[in-house]
Amino acid sequence: MPDVEWIMENCHMMRDNGCWGGEKQISYASPDGQYTYYINKRKDGTYYLHGACKHYGRT
């Protein structure tokens, strides 16, 4: 899995998913279109990778 900084610099921000458990979540699409990464922003302002989803069947 790529790190948060790489995702935020190289991936396309798809949408703001709002707040989940007090943390803001943003979806990013990988450059090759195979993955969606979910980045959460903690209340202290730091970011972390919450999860990823692979899109099967895309080339």
Explain the meaning of each model-derived region:
Residues 12-59:
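Acidic, low-complexity, intrinsically disordered interaction modules
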